[in-house]
Amino acid sequence: MTVSRKPSKPEINPEEIEVILATDCGSTTSKARFFKKLGNEYRFVASGEAPTTVEAPFEDVTLGVRNAVREVEELTGHKMLAPHGIITPSKGEKEGVDLYVTTSSAGGGLQMMVAGVVKTMTAESAERAALGAGAIVMDLMAVNDGRRPYQKIERIRHLRPDMILMAGGTDGGNVTHVVETAELIDAAKPKPRLGIDFELPIVFAGNKEARIPVERILNEAYALKVVDNIRPILEFENTDPARNVIHELFMEHVMSHAPGYDKLMKWTPIPIMPTPAGEGRMFQTIAKTYNANVIGVGLGGATTNVYSTYENKFVRTVSANLGMSYSICNVLKEAGTKNIVRWVPFDIEEEDLRNRLYNKMIRPTTIPQTVKDLVVEHAVAREALRLGFEHHKLLARPLRGVQRRRTIADIFEQEAFEETYIDMLNVNWLAGTGGLLSHAPRRAQSALMLIDGFQPEGVTNLAQDSVFMMPHLGVLSTVHPKAAMEIFEKDCLVRIGTCIAPRGVGKEGEVMKVVVRMPDNSLLEEQVGFGSVKKIALKEGEKAEMEIFPFRGGDVGRGSGKARKVVVEGGVVGTILDARGRPLVLPDDDNERKQKLIEWFKALDAYPERLYELCGR
């Protein structure tokens, strides 16, 4: 058994770094981003992308990385590749880089199983810790999860996780259930997903009184690491020690056995970071920089990651079955055909929809060829975002077990779920990253996807990753925070605009009114009827004073029906007045629904006129 220490960073002098290469090995695409010091600041220069090559027939992640970097070389004339890998340090103006860093979610990313004593307490805290480390949680096992021991043993054997995180018990409490969990894991004799000959890493972050018996059971056959208890007392959750050691073990035991990663690890002096961990760092940066409550999303090919920093509490969740390429058919299964079709403004047969999505699943690197294909893909994205956020809210909630004094029997019977602590009226920023959002042909399309998927309320700043570089900057920030922050502010974060959306439902004929003091000091009055949207052209970098008068019963943050004065910031789309109500409900009548969708699309200039011609509108 080893008691974990936080791994030390390699000695890198930021003052000597002028040329930086960062890559992300995604489930579908490997993405290279080239940064350079221009004058006194670091800027984004060029990008390259290529299909990821972690699966057969290639089974070597470095081939995809090389292809992506080669595209950057062709665009810039800057040579970076050599037979041994990346040329470091830089040699003159046009050869080599001073720093190479990378993130990865290829090959399934980091797949973990978590275990605790009580499903809604220590097991849930363990799940938050694993998700915060960038893992996909394959299963959550608890004493009171309703499964018999033999069922749990079969499940552990079948899953073959990369790592197990085991929690349970407060410090000084009963050790019986914790020991039983360790015995159950040992009885299953789990084998790791990659590299059958190496020891499966197990992190124990439970009752410190149980360390010795857990060591006796697990130390011989597994790579056991012990860290501080995740829930030392019921009122406190301590996930950082577990998260840090998960990162360490991810490199040491998991990445080293994935196809080609042994080579990739030698190319970079910085530990490879899971893609979601990199994204999460940058969403936390937004929250810290603007002292704000932030919800972020990474919409990937295999997963949908949702991040929230709300009143200084950071939570990440991953919906491992919701993605836009490999997992697109799971979105269809989870959401249902009807929920996807409701966002499509033209007639489409269910069989046609299924066939389109099946083709995307088996050809994950393809992109939409027609505007109708694009609209269908965006409809699926809305549902992936909605479902991912619903999942997120199940974990973004108060700690369980601290509300009142209760017996252990009461705790085991506790099944009622408290609602999330996230109040959308208090969310200041909604931001997105991931290929589909970053590469949407028009920013208004990504704005609508974010608004329809998350349904922000009140006054919310909208932003997105310009060309998908948040993961790259996240790993860069661990060694060169100045460079990461400069690039993030100047080249990464695109301000889409501000969404004004009252909570509540109005009636036909009611209006939301705004009075705006524009940047040129002119006064603008706008009205938008309930069920409609409208755009005010407020450019990026511009600010305006606005007084909002919601429709009757609507709440924009000051109470039902009350006006609110705010300063709004512009963006590439502008200020979006969304009077469709919350929750957002589409008309039941098919023709009325299609008409509404087209009305909303036109109001924001989201799609080309060709779409409306094809829809006969």
Residue ranges and their predicted role:
Residues 368-372:
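Conserved nucleotide-sensing/catalytic segment adjacent to the nucleotide-binding pocket
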Residues 339-360, 481-487, 498, 509:
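Charged, amphipathic alpha-helical linkers/stalks
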Residues 34, 41-53, 281-354, 441-464:
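Glycine-rich phosphate-binding loop of actin/hexokinase-like ATP-binding domains
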Residues 27-32:
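Mobile, glycine-rich extracellular loop/lid and propeptide segments
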Residues 312, 324, 328, 346, ...:
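Short, well-ordered loop/turn and helix-capping segments at boundaries between secondary-structure elements
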Residues 1-22, 35-43, 49-293, 373-382, ...:
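Nucleotide/phosphate-binding catalytic cleft detector across ATP-hydrolyzing
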Residues 335-339, 354-362, 366, 376, ...:
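Basic, amphipathic N-terminal segments
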Residues 26, 142-143, 169, 207, ...:
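An acidic- and aromatic-residue-enriched active-site/binding cleft used to recognize and process polar
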